[in-house]
Amino acid sequence: MPILISPSDNTGWGLGKLRIRATGLTFTDSTPVSVRHYFRDSGGQRNGRATRAHLRRNLKKYRRKHDRRTHTRRVQPDVILIKAGRRTARSARRRSARKSRSEKTGPRIRYTRRI
């Protein structure tokens, strides 16, 4: 577990895990690491892991809970086509409205904008 020591200008440089205490002690899994006012075991990161059986049980619960959402009614193909047709007609109306707006301005304004 290397640490970072920061001088006054905050550039910082690292020390390896062998020199943390400046005593030459090497840390093992059984050696606690000093963290401010308390000691934390260096193997603490391996605590709280779930077993495979526990994971399988929770996965089954999750599937049971969320499986109902996947069974939705199928949409008929003609409904999809009707919606697509409406969308196309709406975009065509919008496009034609945009064209008619630009034609109202007249040819001279249209060309002066391009220059």
Swiss-Prot record:
Cleaved near the N-terminus by the viral protease during virion maturation to form the mature protein. One of its GO terms (biological process) is symbiont entry into host cell. GO terms for molecular function: DNA binding. Pfam families: Adeno_VII (PF03228). InterPro entries: Adeno_VII (IPR004912). Belongs to the adenoviridae histone-like nucleoprotein family. All late proteins expressed from the major late promoter are produced by alternative splicing and alternative polyadenylation of the same gene giving rise to non-overlapping ORFs. A leader sequence is present in the N-terminus of all these mRNAs and is recognized by the viral shutoff protein to provide expression although conventional translation via ribosome scanning from the cap has been shut off in the host cell. Interacts with the core-capsid bridging protein; this interaction bridges the virus core to the capsid. Interacts with host NPM1; this interaction might play a role in placing the pre-histone-like nucleoprotein on the viral DNA or regulating viral gene expression. Interacts with host HMGB1; this interaction inhibits host immune response. This is Pre-histone-like nucleoprotein. It comes from Snake adenovirus serotype 1.
